[in-house]
Amino acid sequence: MGRWASESRAPGTMRGGAWTAERSEGPHLRTEMMETLLFTDERCLLHETPYSHPESPKRLRKILDSLAAEPVPGTEQATVRPATRDELLLVHEVRHVDAILELRGRSTQLDVDTWLSPGSVDAALLAAGATVEAVRALKEGRARNAFVLVRPPGHHAESNRSMGFCIFNNVALAAAVARKQLGVERILIAGWDFHQGNGTQESFWDRSDVLCFSTHRKPPFYPQTGTLE
């Protein structure tokens, strides 16, 4: 694959609903590794939430439209796949995974602020699978960087429950795959959010090879976790 020219803004093209910046063919810019792979899928928009809910499809739609109108040089969209049940079981309990999968195609409320629409389970599987594939791409040397642009989010989802807009824990799953299947010996997960990633913390609380670093508002504040103690 070719590297993008970084000194000028490249026009974009649409390919099957995906955007890509046009590639420079200058020999001095050729390389075997893509600069940044973008993992996203418009099917993540199928996760619909109630009117005025802060985790809205409009958030992702706005970003995708902006990227289509003004592509970022040095990026290319990668193929996204759903996470498998076996992958989900690396961080989630069987009863939680199976309970969510049984709700595919249905609308329901999982907790006070976490909802499912008919497309939510498929969107959640794609979000988790995209994060796993991003880690694989980096480990295999297919890109220097990866950016995962998906929804629903994941860092509040614990091993046995969905919460805080999150259904499956995308980042925890990717870290588990990296550690158990890709031979990564040490992992740093940096969380930058107003709310602490309680689900990610729970996934690796007893492990010395995964460090979860988080900047967040301290309790008393949702999800009431993340104190210095």
Predicted regions: what is each one?
Residues 6-8, 24:
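Serine residues within intrinsically disordered or low-complexity segments
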Residues 119-132:
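Glycine-rich anion/phosphate-binding loops
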Residues 23-33:
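Short, Lys/Arg-enriched N-terminal segments with co-localized hydrophobic residues
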Residues 109-122:
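Short glycine/proline- and acidic residue-enriched helix-loop micro-motifs
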